[in-house]
Amino acid sequence: MAFRRTEGMSMIQALAMTVAEIPVFLYTTFGQSAFSQLRLTPGLRKVLFATALGTVALALAAHQLKRRRRKKKQVGPEMGGEHLGTVPLPILMARKVPSVKKGYSNRRVQSPSSKSNDTLSGISSIEPSKHSGSSHSLASMVVVNSSSPTAACSGPWETRGIEESVTTADGNAESLYMQGMELFEEALQKWEQALSVGQRGDSGSTPTPGDGLRNPETASEALSEPESQRKEFAEKLESLLHRAYHLQEEFGSTFPADSMLLDLERTLMLPLTEGSLRLRADDGDSLTSEDSFFSATELFESLQVGDYPIPLSRPAAAYEEALQLVKEGKVPCRTLRTELLGCYSDQDFLAKLHCVRQAFEGLLEDKSHQLFFGEVGRQMVTGLMTKAEKSPKGFLESYEEMLSYALRPETWATTRLELEGRGVVCMSFFDIVLDFILMDAFEDLENPPSSVLAVLRNRWLSDSFKETALATACWSVLKAKRRLLMVPDGFISHFYSVSEHVSPVLAFGFLGPKPQLSEVCAFFKHQIVQYLTDMFDLDNVRYTSVPALAEDILQLSRRRSEILLGYLGVPAASSIGLNGVLPRENGPPEALQ
């Protein structure tokens, strides 16, 4: 019998196996006859039995020790190579997040107050950390996340070295603040992504009612511990986002207030007066986003034209003179179109309005310009009616009658009385045609009566019936208004005659179900509004003098009319009015008396 040790076998196990082979060796060597002749004493039998039992116990103990040693070797590398991303879920859930100060960034973050009630009901209360986002708190986070003692010991020193290098490279506190804003913004994005991924996972793993009915025990197990942990983690993450949003609103609206206000004032070229300094002091005392919002509102409401000059890109002597008249309250107006025409303020609109009135007054002293504007209006409405597949014959007759009535000097006094009764404060082309007729018509079409909308939105009615009903409604309203006229045959009466042909077409175009006609009417309105916006823009026309402004308005009118008439398929009217005649579709030109 030789002592053998196989590969992969320990010394103790090999010895035990050798001892266990002794009885077999003796039996095979001396034979069964020798054992039959052998007489064992009771003491020897006890020794042999104890030896065999001890050998078996020793083999089992060696096997058990070997299994435990292998298990330790497998667990050791896993714990040593564990990273931050593999931290168990309970540790992540129990970990407290330090508060970080953050300002507003370029991306607008939605506040949790705008979310649903179900989302808000899942927010759990977490005690906020009393530590700031300094290097020490960051180092503590590194120690918690790291299982290596080397990393834990070197964390504070590495963080301190990074902080010193950043401070040396850029000692500006404002730039450091902006870097913190960017880092906190990245953290917000990661937290939002984690929350959205968790919500998608919960919705994707929601068991169906059929599964629960087929196997209730399996369904209850699926909704047990892992799902409750995920739900608790999502609630705490949502609470973290909720507090982060509040920090963002609080510190973003107060910390850089002075520098932001100074940049704003430099951009608008506004001087620092006592009023703005007082508002800045009030802003510095406020800590909530609501206070900051109202203080900003007060600031912009206080930026009046009378106190602060509007930045002018070019000299505008006529505009400055009109602005002085506005300060004295000498520029009346029926309706303020400040926002529609893109003006800085009501005073800015009134000053430009005064200049535009003077420019149109100078333009319409020329007979050819009168004919030009009259012909452009006629061709625009004719093109609209042609696009709507309506005959413009009745409109042309009523339009010529209104135009000839308006150009007679003996009718001007009566026309003034009629228009003053409608709120028109100045007898200018802008106030009568552009504002009273066109802009009021667009406003009426934006807010139609509910009865008209009910007919147009009825799916059971045909388009032809809707068009007929809408035209009947327009005629009924105009007929009722005509009965209340102060002058039965005056300017307003002629205007109503024109409206009887135009109003149904415009109303059905803007409100009706035909997309092609709606597109044409929308383009028509856009060109008119853009024409007025360009007219009230200091960069597009010259407000240096009234003649220069009149010349620019005329060129602007020609350009816009060419665009609109070209879209409607009508010949351009740029050359009309230069020879004092109106071209006719059939027959020779006819001079306008």
UniProtKB/Swiss-Prot annotation:
Sequence positions bearing Phosphothreonine: T206, T273
UniProt keyword terms in alphabetical order: Membrane, Mitochondrion, Mitochondrion outer membrane, Phosphoprotein, Transmembrane, Transmembrane helix
Chain segments carrying region Disordered: 101-134, 195-228
Motif mapping: FFAT: 292-298
GO cellular component, one term: plasma membrane
List of residues that carry Phosphoserine: S132, S220, S224, S228, S276, S295
GO terms for biological process, alphabetical: bone development; mitochondrial fusion
Low complexity bias spans: 124-134
Coiled-coil residue spans: none
UniProt PTM comment: Phosphorylation at Ser-295 of the FFAT motif activates interaction with MOSPD2.
Biased composition (Polar residues): 107-123
Main localization category: mitochondrion
Matches recorded under Pfam families: Miga (PF10265)
Compartment annotation: Mitochondrion outer membrane
Transmembrane residue ranges: 11-31, 42-62, 563-583
Domain of life per record: Eukaryota
GO terms of molecular function: protein heterodimerization activity; protein homodimerization activity
Domain comment (free text): The FFAT motif is involved in the interaction with MOSPD2 and its phosphorylation regulates this interaction.
Subunit (UniProt): Homodimer and heterodimer; forms heterodimers with MIGA1. Interacts with PLD6/MitoPLD. Interacts (via phosphorylated FFAT motif) with MOSPD2.
PANTHER family registered for this protein in UniProt: MITOGUARDIN, MITOGUARDIN 2
Family statement: Belongs to the mitoguardin family.
General function of this protein: Regulator of mitochondrial fusion: acts by forming homo- and heterodimers at the mitochondrial outer membrane and facilitating the formation of PLD6/MitoPLD dimers. May act by regulating phospholipid metabolism via PLD6/MitoPLD.
Protein name: Mitoguardin 2
